[in-house]
Amino acid sequence: MKQFVLQYLEKKGYPVKDYGTYSDESVDYPDFAHALAEGIENGDVYPGIGICGSGEGMAMTLNKHQGVRAGLAWNKDIAQLIRQHNDANVIVLPGRFIDNKTAEAILDEFFKATFEGGRHERRRESAP
């Protein structure tokens, strides 16, 4: 799925910064989540995309970082809501559970949606 996402981003003209992994070997996803989170925190990357099997471990690790608001999205409706209501600055895809076509629809919606503010801003601010 990662290669598909990279090609999707390039096709759409989005800048790409690849934090790994670079092989099919088993890896520890927190290493890559921390690298992505640091990119978000220091302004090198916005927004970010994380991919792992279920997406949960990546999202949990990313959300341990101040200023990172990672949301797990398995369909385009969730992708829209994590932007509109939660101001997600990272989307996490569950690579084992979605196909490339679904990933493309999810990313299209994530990039199209914008934060609505209002009551959602108050909620966002209360969860640092």
Regions found by a protein language model. Name each.
Residues 7, 34, 38, 60, ...:
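Alpha-helical segments flanking ligand/cofactor-binding loops in enzyme cores
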Residues 15-26:
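A short beta-strand-loop structural module common to alpha/beta enzyme folds
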Residues 32-50, 54:
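Short, structured active-site "lid" loops
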